[in-house]
């Protein structure tokens, strides 16, 4: 018998469910993507979509990227199960940095956790381990000599003052690689050093494409579909001709302090300011003329998190080794 005053079973709201699984709603994704589109990119998207066959028009009146994406949803061209058109439009704009947002996975905010590093802890560990290895190798050599001859250390020292015996000369001549193998661990090897790769993307582009598209895109074909294809091809050719190029490089880090400093400079904008003088040269400014040019710098957050975990694990393992050895 059910009680009349019993509380109903709790039901999850859509936002709570999405937050639990670390997902973004469709409209929240529209806010993230639309908020990063420039006015020039909005004009280009509205121009391309309004010229499509059967388009209702009116996208040019959109005042923001959010309004434009909401209008696409209202027309049935973009929904939760079909984001193909939005992905194609972002590729036309060369905004590949916005494509990961279409997966609707919420990105966790990352802040650099700085440590008060004096001398590098890994270098200290390397010196300490090398010192311990030299001591252990020297003691192992003396013990091995005692075991081979079966003599006490005092007798072994007296014999080494004079000329070595024939048996010792034969052993030394027959096994020349044994001391080299024992001394190899004493040298710090750089091949086994743990590193992580951080991918850096730098791109220079024009701030506005509208005037160039207005001058270079026109079609006189009577059919709507043919005119749309002609306009789209011309706009793509104009944008490709105005591509100023990009650079993608992988930076290796072996110290956690350097990685945190690099990420902190990226978040604060110091990295962008430092790269501006390297890429926006006088030759580039003379080539573009009076048009405004901007520099875009992107560092993958997933690379930073994975690299930080890797280096932090190396620091923890290196800290446990001296305690286990002692």
From Swiss-Prot:
Expressed in most tissues. High levels were found in liver, kidney, heart, ovary, spleen, testes, skeletal muscle and peripheral blood leukocytes. Expression was absent or low in colon and small intestine. GO terms for molecular function: DNA binding; signaling receptor complex adaptor activity. It is found in: Nucleus, Nucleolus. GO terms for cellular component: nucleolus; nucleoplasm. InterPro entries: DEATH-like_dom_sf, DED_dom, DEDD/DEDD2, TRADD-like_N. Residues 155-174 have a biased composition (Basic residues). It comes from the Eukaryota. A motif (Nuclear localization signal) lies at residues 104-109. Interacts with CASP8, CASP10 and GTF3C3. Homodimerizes and heterodimerizes with DEDD. This is DNA-binding death effector domain-containing protein 2. It comes from Homo sapiens (Human). The gene is DEDD2.
């Amino acid at each position: 018998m059910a009680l009349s005053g019993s509380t109903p079973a709790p039901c999850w709201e859509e936002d709570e469910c999405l937050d639990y699984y670390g997902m973004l709603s469709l409209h929240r994704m529209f806010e993230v993507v639309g908020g990063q589109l420039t006015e020039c990119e909005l004009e280009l998207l509205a121009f391309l979509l309004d010229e499509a066959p059967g388009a209702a028009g009116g996208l040019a009146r959109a005042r923001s990227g959010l309004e434009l994406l909401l209008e696409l949803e209202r027309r049935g061209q973009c929904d939760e199960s079909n984001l193909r058109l939005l992905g194609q439009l972002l590729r036309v704009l060369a905004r590949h940095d916005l494509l990961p947002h279409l997966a609707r996975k919420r990105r966790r905010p990352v802040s650099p956790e700085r440590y008060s590093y004096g001398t590098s802890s890994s270098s200290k560990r390397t010196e300490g381990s090398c010192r311990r290895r030299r001591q252990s190798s020297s003691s192992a050599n003396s013990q091995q000599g005692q075991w081979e001859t079966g003599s006490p250390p005092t007798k072994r020292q007296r014999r080494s003052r004079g000329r070595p015996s024939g048996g010792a000369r034969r052993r030394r001549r027959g096994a020349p690689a044994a001391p080299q193998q024992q001394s190899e661990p004493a040298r710090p090897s750089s091949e086994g050093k743990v590193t992580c790769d951080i991918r850096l993307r730098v791109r220079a582009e024009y701030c506005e494409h509208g005037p160039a598209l207005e001058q270079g895109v026109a079609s006189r074909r009577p059919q709507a579909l043919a005119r749309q294809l002609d306009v789209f091809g011309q706009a793509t050719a104009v944008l490709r001709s105005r591509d100023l190029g990009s650079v993608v490089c992988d930076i290796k880090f072996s110290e956690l302090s350097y990685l945190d400093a690099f990420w902190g400079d990226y978040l604060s904008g110091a990295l962008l300011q430092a790269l501006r003088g390297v890429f926006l040269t006088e030759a580039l400014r003379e080539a573009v003329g009076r048009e405004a040019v901007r520099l875009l710098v992107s560092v993958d957050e997933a690379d930073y998190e994975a690299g930080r975990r890797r280096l932090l694990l190396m620091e923890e393992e290196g800290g446990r080794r001296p305690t286990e050895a002692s």
